[in-house]
């Protein structure tokens, strides 16, 4: 139950790379139904995100693996090296 509470608290947070550049806003969290583990974050990319353009993210919504998350506070920080246009 704690995982779901944390997931609800994370929704709507801004997502930044570990280089301090904004990617977008967290809109959903995908959880494995069997294990209950968080698998991916669904992020709505900001239209003016320079980081997204540099990485090659052209879709409006992208899946970012939860393993890329390095910190969560007022914002979510993800490791840019683990985010790719192939997600």
Regions found by a protein language model. Name each.
Residues 1-87:
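Peripheral interaction segments used for macromolecular assembly
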